[in-house]
Amino acid sequence: MAPVPIYVKGGIWTNLEDQILKAAVQKYGTHAWSKVASLLQKKNARQCQSRWNEFLNPSLNFKPFSQQEDDKLLDLAKRIPNQWKSIGEMMGRPAQTCIDRYNILLAIDKDDLELAATTGVQIGEINPNNESLPAKADKDELLDEEREMLAEARARLLNTQGKKATRKIRERMLEESKRVAFLQKRRELKQAGVDSKIKAPRKKYSSQMDYNEDIAYEQQPLPGIYDTSKEDEQTEKLLKSFEKLVERKGLLDRKSDEKKTIPQKRRQGEQITSSVTKLDSVLTDEYKKPKLELTPATLKGSKRKINKTTSILHLFESLPSPKNDFEIVLDDLDEEMESTDAFNTESSYVNGKYPLEALISSTEHQSENKAMEIMEYIPTVFQIKTELQVPSPIVDPKNEIDRELNRIISAKENGNPIYNSTEVNNYLEEIINSASTTEVPSTVLHPKLETSLKTITPATEHELLGMERKVHELRTALEDSVKSHREAVSQLSQDFEEKLHPTVSGLAYQYYTDYMKYRNDHKTMQEETQSLAEQIKLAQRSQ
């Protein structure tokens, strides 16, 4: 096993760590630095807090000090000496910036009173004030550990659920996976021929309700005056058949059930029937009415067509004789219909049966007579066209449409004029009058549209191909002219990123370090010169 690398917490901050720190502060706030530091591999909680308070806080002021701020800084340093965090909060600046500015303003003995400056660092030493320096620039590609740290921080910061909700979701998923595994095992056992039932879950407390067996807030109906034992048997039968179906095939598997035929279903239902024995009290049985027994159905098996007229007549015959002493006075139309019906029924009644053909012929004869009385024929101008072929007449007409067609065909063959009813003639005349009065819209085009259509000539296929060829040539020429410039620009940018930028950054850092060394040496030389001048003056005075 490879040795685990030991990281030293600290070092200069990178841009990636700054961005992760900002996002973590937005989520966890400025009081949970241990959670913030858990997202950064090379920083601890104190360093994260110092980095935020000294560099990344948007409320900090990094502008140059003014004269009023210098006076305020000196005043605060006298009032609360060595409490630079409090002074920085009062000034609205980082504590290290206030220390650096105070060291610049003071011109006293370095060994006694001067505080540690941020720039007094030699090459190779650990800078204790990395939190107040700008972040290091990102590299072209992130390292593996940085990429892993970024992925973990993104996953944790995007998670908006708490620990309890996450645990509940994990437990729910675990229960669902257990249930699916149990159902799969039960299905495999059923295929192997081993029947296993689903056990009820263990109750957490004694009064817990099992909603698969019991019904919440169920209220049993009070016994009534009617006997409902047959309905109870039917309900019990349906319940048992449903439980058996669920036990054998499942709750949602109904495709195979739809393919069953009716006799198979009936046979299966007869096998499941079971009598329900019930102890009824004597008191309730005395007040119950007997069961309603209906006559059994006369038609069983295949269905056949029933004539409405014969069924109505049979129903009238089955009615009992009236018990009233008065006679029912019918209207004239009802009396005529009754007389005709009585005549037809007497003539058609043979050996206690009503033939279907006699009833149909009587109804057709009545409808034909009624239609002939209502219709009044008048000559009309509409005739069958001579070029059309006359169809053959219908041998056995069944309705008015067939009879009307036979009448028109016979009139055409005999050369007689064809008559229509007054209603049809009036309707046709209205259609002709409405068609003659309608105005037909003009199809003349607008003059401007007509001139534009005449002047514009569509381009031919040869012209379109020529235009497409020219566009392609211009595009290739433009790409060739830009290609050399694009390569030069990419080469320059690559040289700048690989060579010039690192060199300039190193030179700038070296210049900054040398300049700070020179400034410290110059300050030391000035102090030594002043001390020598004072000693010379004292020597001259003593002489």
From Swiss-Prot:
<feature type="coiled-coil region">
    <location>
        <begin position="135"/>
        <end position="188"/>
    </location>
</feature>
<dbReference type="InterPro" id="IPR047242">
    <property type="entry name" value="CDC5L/Cef1"/>
</dbReference>
<dbReference type="InterPro" id="IPR047240">
    <property type="entry name" value="SANT_CDC5L_II"/>
</dbReference>
<dbReference type="GO" id="GO:0005681">
    <property type="term" value="C:spliceosomal complex"/>
</dbReference>
<dbReference type="GO" id="GO:0003677">
    <property type="term" value="F:DNA binding"/>
</dbReference>
<feature type="region of interest" description="Disordered">
    <location>
        <begin position="256"/>
        <end position="275"/>
    </location>
</feature>
<feature type="domain" description="Myb-like">
    <location>
        <begin position="59"/>
        <end position="106"/>
    </location>
</feature>
<dbReference type="Pfam" id="PF13921">
    <property type="entry name" value="Myb_DNA-bind_6"/>
</dbReference>
<keyword id="KW-0507">mRNA processing</keyword>
<keyword id="KW-0508">mRNA splicing</keyword>
<dbReference type="InterPro" id="IPR017930">
    <property type="entry name" value="Myb_dom"/>
</dbReference>
<keyword id="KW-0238">DNA-binding</keyword>
<keyword id="KW-0539">Nucleus</keyword>
<comment type="function">
    <text>Involved in pre-mRNA splicing and cell cycle control.</text>
</comment>
<dbReference type="InterPro" id="IPR009057">
    <property type="entry name" value="Homeodomain-like_sf"/>
</dbReference>
<comment type="subunit">
    <text>Associated with the spliceosome.</text>
</comment>
<dbReference type="InterPro" id="IPR001005">
    <property type="entry name" value="SANT/Myb"/>
</dbReference>
<keyword id="KW-0963">Cytoplasm</keyword>
<comment type="similarity">
    <text>Belongs to the CEF1 family.</text>
</comment>
<dbReference type="GO" id="GO:0000974">
    <property type="term" value="C:Prp19 complex"/>
</dbReference>
<keyword id="KW-0747">Spliceosome</keyword>
<keyword id="KW-0677">Repeat</keyword>
<feature type="domain" description="HTH myb-type">
    <location>
        <begin position="1"/>
        <end position="58"/>
    </location>
</feature>
<dbReference type="GO" id="GO:0000398">
    <property type="term" value="P:mRNA splicing, via spliceosome"/>
</dbReference>
<keyword id="KW-0175">Coiled coil</keyword>
<dbReference type="GO" id="GO:0005737">
    <property type="term" value="C:cytoplasm"/>
</dbReference>
<protein>
    <recommendedName>
        <fullName>Pre-mRNA-splicing factor CEF1</fullName>
    </recommendedName>
</protein>
<feature type="coiled-coil region">
    <location>
        <begin position="459"/>
        <end position="541"/>
    </location>
</feature>
<feature type="DNA-binding region" description="H-T-H motif">
    <location>
        <begin position="33"/>
        <end position="56"/>
    </location>
</feature>
